[in-house]
Amino acid sequence: MPWKELPVTDPIRLTGLLTGGWDKLAFQPFAEGVEIYPILEGEPALALLKYEPGAAVPRHLHTGLETICVLSGSQSDEHGTYQTGTVIANPEGTSHEVWSDDGCIVLIQWN
C-alpha cells in the first residue's frame, strides 16, 4: 500500500466534560427538547446532545455504528435506562427510540 500524505489538522479538545463543562457551549436546536453541539461533522460525526426532561428522539435506523456515552443524567430506549458513565454501542442495522425522563447530556458518535 503506497504512503498517502494526509492533511495536517489540529485535534479538537473539549475539557471538563465529566464535570459540567458543556454549560459554556453554544448548543443548537436538534429535535423538540433536544439540542446539539457538533464537535466533528462528516463520517464519523461526533457531538454532544442535551435532552430536556421528557424529551425524545423518534425511532431511527442506524446505517452505521452509533456510540453513546452518558455524561450526566440518564437516557433510555426500549432496551433499558442508561445512567451516567454508561456506554451504549448500536451497530449498523439496529433501530431504537431514545428519551430521557430526567434530562441528560450524552457524547454521541455515528457513521
PLM regions: where:
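A short, N-terminal "cap"/entry segment at the start of jelly-roll beta-barrel domains
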Residues: M1-E43
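Ligand-binding loop in jelly-roll beta-barrel domains
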Residues: E92-N111
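Residue-level marker of beta-strand positions
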Residues: A56, T86-V87, I105
